[in-house]
Amino acid sequence: MGASEKRKDYISWDEYFMGIAMLSGMRSKDPNTQVGACIVSPDNKILSMGYNGFPKGCSDDEFPWERENDKDSNLTKYPFVTHSELNAILNYRGGSLEGTKLYVSLFPCNECAKAIIQAGIHTVVYDSDKYRGTPSNRAARRSAFHTAGQDVRYISGSERQIKGV
């Protein structure tokens, strides 16, 4: 490669934004599942980011991180954790999210799918689909994304090792 030619091995926009989503997920204190999300404008500007965690003002040390509790299901993380997609939507302080793209490291649950559609986000790009086939996952695919006409696609965020990460 001569000095007058541009580099050819740079990462794509999809790789870049999925990398940002995955990096955001590393902020999660959840010991089992770390999910990150990044909302991007049609002209490839980052608008917002989020990761799964407890709401503002709720101490990470006082609320449970357990996935199961045989005595009381309210003593698990599930009633309290806000998912990365919803955090990214709520963290946005601009105008409309109409026509934007959401990069998320894990395929959205049905509740997040509804919020994504209502926010006007048009494209969802995800990396992992480890809950494929679960009731929430099937509902998100069928009733939410498919019916609403969302563009949903898979990319692997780990196709290329990001140096220094």
Regions inferred by a protein language model and the residue ranges of each:
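Zinc-dependent deaminase catalytic domain
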Residues: 1-165
